[in-house]
Amino acid sequence: MIKMTVYELSKNSQFNVLTMPEPERETDGVYIGDLLSWVMGRARENNVWITIMSNINVVAVASLSDVSCVVLAEDVTLDSDVLATAEQKGINVLSTPLSAYDAAVLLSGM
């Protein structure tokens, strides 16, 4: 994956912006995981975190892990109150119809 901003990543037609309070945040690598405690200990700063989890804890884990953005795979969405919290905490959230695997493959080629 070439380093790029979240804004640049979002320009790919496979990604939909749900909230992007920090569009200039740099990306560096990808982490795929749904077990939140596992993600907290393994996702790295500026990673793109791909998940199918869809609750408020996603925002907390993204903040603690300092990922550049969360990508919700398989058209998963977040409730409006969760998106508002993500916006407030500076967490970029995108969605994609792709599976987590296919999203990671796409990102690896960007």
Language-model features and meaning:
Residues M1-R42, V93, D102:
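Conserved catalytic and cofactor-binding micro-motifs
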Residues E24, L36-V48, M53-M110:
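Feature captures the catalytic cores and cofactor-binding loops of soluble hydro-lyases/lyases
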